[in-house]
C-alpha cells in the first residue's frame, strides 16, 4: 500500500511540474516598459527574441539605435 502512495505522489508531482513549465509566457508587460534612454543592455548583437527572454530579459526591436534586449524593471515590494 505504501509503495502505491509513493508512486502516485511521484506521478502527480511529475505531471504538475511539466504543466507549469508549459505555461511560462515571459515577463509581464509592465516590467518591460523601460524608456529607451534607460535601457540596460542584456544581450549581444544578433540575439533572437527567444534567446533574450530565456535570459530573463525583455526584447523590443521597435526602436532603432537602442538595446533591443534589455534588463527589465525591478519588481518592487511594498513594506510597511
Curated annotation (Swiss-Prot):
A Gene Ontology biological process term: regulation of glucose metabolic process
Which Gene3D superfamilies does the record match to this protein? Spasmolytic Protein, domain 1
Lineage, top-rank taxon, reads Eukaryota
Signal sequence, start to end: 1-21
Which Pfam family would be a valid example here? Answer: Trefoil
Q: Which SMART domains match?
A: PD
Q: Which UniProt keywords apply?
A: Cytoplasm, Disulfide bond, Extracellular matrix, Secreted, Signal
Is the Cytoplasm keyword given for this protein? yes
The answer to whether keyword Secreted applies is yes
Q: Name one GO cellular component term.
A: secretory granule
Which InterPro entries is this protein grouped with?
P_trefoil_chordata, P_trefoil_CS, P_trefoil_dom, P_trefoil_dom_sf
Summary of the function given for this chain in its UniProt record: Involved in the maintenance and repair of the intestinal mucosa. Promotes the mobility of epithelial cells in healing processes (motogen).
**How would you summarize the oligomeric state and partners of this protein?**
Monomer. Homodimer; disulfide-linked.
**Protein name from the UniProt record:** Trefoil factor 3
